[in-house]
Amino acid sequence: MLLIPAIDLKEGRCVRLKQGLMEEATVFSDSPAETALHWFKQGARRLHLVDLNGAFAGVPQNLPAIKDILAAVAKDIPVQLGGGIRDLKTIGQYLDLGLNDVIIGTAAVKNPDFVREACKAFPGRIIVGLDAKDGMAAIDGWATVTGHHVIDLAKRFEDDGVNSIIYTDIGRDGMMSGVNIDATVKLAQTVRIPVISSGGLTGLDDIRALCAAEKHGVAGAITGRAIYEGSIDFAQAQQLADSLD
C-alpha cells in the first residue's frame, strides 16, 4: 500500500482545505519545495500535487512552485499533479517539466472524449480524479454535484486507457472523519486498474483498513491534513503499510 503525501498549492504556498472550500484554507508552509523534500526524506515514494488556483481558474496558476518542487525531488520519486488541466497542450507542458503523471478531474466529467484523446497522446501518463458526494461526481472545485455516478465514469475511463483512478469522498476530505472504505472498495471492485483513495485519512486504523482492501484493487492512499497536523506520523504509517502488504 502506497501512501502519497499531498501538497496543495494556493498562491505559491502549501495549504490544506476543508471540503474543497478556498476560504477554509490553512497555510502549512511558504516553501512547497521544502515540504516536498521533507516528505521524501520521511520515506514518500510518490507525491501528489494540486494546483488549487488552477482548479478554479481552469489554467495553471502555480508554475513557479511546481517547478521548484520538481527541481527538488523529481529525480528521486514520481510526482503527479492535478488542478486546471483542461487541454492537451497543458498536459504536454507539465510532462515536459518532469511530472510523471497528470490528473484530469473536472474536464474528464464535462468532456469525457478529452480523456480518450489524452490517453492516446500520452499513453500511460493519465490519471482521472473522481470526486464524489454520495456516489455522484462533483466538479469545478467541488462546487457542482452532477448527475453522473462515479462507478459509471470509472468504467468508461478505464476503457479509454487511464492508468489509475483517484477517488475522493468530498464529504470527508480535510474533515479528519475517516476514510470511506466501503465506497472506495465498491469502486475498486468495478474496474481492473488501481484505485487510489483520497480524503478522510485520520489514523493508523485507516491504514490497516486500506491495506485490507488492497486485495480488492485499492492500491494507495493520498494523505494531507493528518500528516500536516500530526495525527499520523508519515514514516511510521508507511512502515506499517509496508509490513501489512
UniProtKB/Swiss-Prot annotation:
Q: Pathway of this protein?
A: Amino-acid biosynthesis; L-histidine biosynthesis; L-histidine from 5-phospho-alpha-D-ribose 1-diphosphate: step 4/9
The UniProt record lists the EC number as 5.3.1.16
- Show the Pfam families listed in the entry: His_biosynth
Location(s) in or outside the cell: Cytoplasm
Give the GO terms filed under biological process for this record: L-histidine biosynthetic process
Signal peptide range: none
**Which CDD domains does the protein's record reference?**
HisA
GO molecular-function annotation terms? 1-(5-phosphoribosyl)-5-[(5-phosphoribosylamino)methylideneamino]imidazole-4-carboxamide isomerase activity
Any stretches that span the bilayer, and where are they?
Answer: none
What is the active site of this protein? 8, 131
Which superkingdom does the taxonomy of this entry point to?
Bacteria
Catalysed reactions listed for this entry = 1-(5-phospho-beta-D-ribosyl)-5-[(5-phospho-beta-D-ribosylamino)methylideneamino]imidazole-4-carboxamide = 5-[(5-phospho-1-deoxy-D-ribulos-1-ylimino)methylamino]-1-(5-phospho-beta-D-ribosyl)imidazole-4-carboxamide
Q: Which UniProt keywords apply?
A: Amino-acid biosynthesis, Cytoplasm, Histidine biosynthesis, Isomerase
Enzyme kind, highest EC tier = isomerase
Q: Name one GO cellular component term.
A: cytoplasm
Gene3D superfamilies for this protein:
Aldolase class I (3.20.20.70)
Coarsely, its chief localization is: cytoplasm
The chain's disulfide connectivity reads none
Q: Which family does it belong to?
A: Belongs to the HisA/HisF family.
Identify this protein by name: 1-(5-phosphoribosyl)-5-[(5-phosphoribosylamino)methylideneamino] imidazole-4-carboxamide isomerase
Tell me the gene name: hisA
